[in-house]
Amino acid sequence: MRRWLAGLGLLLSPALHAALPVEPLRLLGEHPLDGMPSGNFSGLARCGDALWAVSDRDDDRLYRLQPGETAWQAEAQTFVVPPLPGSGLPWGLRARTKLMGTLRGGEMDLEGLSCDARGNRYLVSEAHAAVLQLPEIGQPQWLALPPALLRQARASGMLLKFNAMFEGIAVDPAGERLWLAAERERRGLLVVHRVQSVWQCSGSCVLRSEDGPALPPAQLESSRSWAKSFADLAFHGDKLFSLERLAHQICRHSPSTGEVERCWSFADALLADARRYAQPWGSAEALWIDAEGAWIGTDNGTLPRGDGETRPMLWHFAAPAEGWNGAP
């Protein structure tokens, strides 16, 4: 009976998600980034006293974001990527990924960044379905993720298509729980737990798996549907937050079940004529949440927005009046 009820909850959760009230977020500021020549701003986290970013075109560096008057400066910190472990992905996906990385740059395709309280930084590679840990002191190393993670994800219909793999990562402050987002077709949320020094699935690694098309926000006045997608994850106040690229929303989830609890919209601000990009599925790609607000970064691939700006952008939104953990 409990399994039947759990399955019913998974079936109903998209409908419940759609019925939740969505409050607009208030834009506090926007900051173009200089110093990220490849563009493709794809991950964001506050580590220590600074915001850090990654680009999915740069395999060997993080960027420390320094505030400025007219633009923020992205200062590169390089590292050496260790040899890759076996990913467990099928040959066809691996071959296509290698070819694309050679043609466009960014063989790792880094698509997310998170930090724990000890200063460890975690970068997720979409191309190889792997997580790289950069300790504050010591050499980078790939996490030994459990084989069941990939096996369960693919059995649930995720991680089956090229360029639709892991697209976001979040780690709790203790460094004991790590969440990954499968981007699209199907999209989903997965979690692994660190027990002593071993990462493992505690029961199922899959928290949430869903598919299906959705319309973009009404501001775009479009009748064409696109695949639902996750763009990034963040962890704050013992809650998991997802960046919903197509919907132009941030959604709060239960970290143990993946259930959607509440969503907030940034569509009014980002789809104003001057800030709008041509791609209808959205360009928001990086997310950080703290008590004061939300930071969102754009992966626009140097394409211009409505006012002609081509640099990556960092947007700062105020937190909801009742806080991120408030009830609808």
Language model features: what each stretch is:
Residues 13-15:
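N-terminal signal peptide c-region/cleavage motif recognized by signal peptidases
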